[in-house]
């Protein structure tokens, strides 16, 4: 990985020099509040309003669980500077299963018949079964877990990883510009990228679908293969140009790009989910999505 998380001593060495941060860490409470509101706003008159509102319920359950059962201080010494919370090597705390139980309890009273059946399955699953499904998701074997269960398991895992990311040093530096497709904190995939305003005006940051961190990647470069050639920007129409798809003809992938200057309330997970018709258009053109939304998992293999 090409972005390094700095130790306390390294932070002091660079304290007097300013450069745009390579990694931005989320404010958990603010993130969930903004996301839930955005999902509910986008659900108005949307053809997929029911699912957007379901996603908002999940996010609000994450916020409620965060407030009721925050992650205790973790033993996070001797972590790697590169991807310190790597999903494949970091030993997670079993508290994530408590988070899953609390999220399910929050959603159950308003669940329809299909969602209620999924909740019942997860409630009856053994610890070993839950951990096995979590392992498959965290190693990106998404097609081995049914999408209805994956949404809930990922919501609990993400709540855990988001809080763990608050307990590591928050300074970072770019080592080089290669291999920036995966999150430098946990190694997971991006949801989308955001072109920011404010102190980071015009800079593009990719948003992690697990620990919710964001990392800088220069524009006019493929977020998947680093190619600078054969890049094109697409939108369904100019009115919806807030959310665009950047395609790469070299690796035939795409990832959405969002622009805060067009709407400061744009939110990567919510706006990505609400613009699913752009995904359909890109797939019809032969491009494969290079990121993953925590509310849209691939179908399970039969």
UniProtKB/Swiss-Prot annotation:
- Keyword Cytoplasm part of the UniProt annotation: yes
Q: Name one GO molecular function term.
A: ferric iron binding
The biological process GO terms on file are: protein maturation
Compartments, as annotated in UniProt: Cytoplasm
Where is it mainly found? cytoplasm
Question: Would you tell me the Gene Ontology cellular component terms?
Answer: cytosol
Q: Which UniProt keywords apply?
A: Cytoplasm
Name the HAMAP family on file: FdeH
Give the protein's function: Necessary for formate dehydrogenase activity.
Q: What is this protein called?
A: Protein FdhE homolog
Lineage, uppermost ranks: Bacteria, Pseudomonadati, Pseudomonadota, Gammaproteobacteria, Pasteurellales
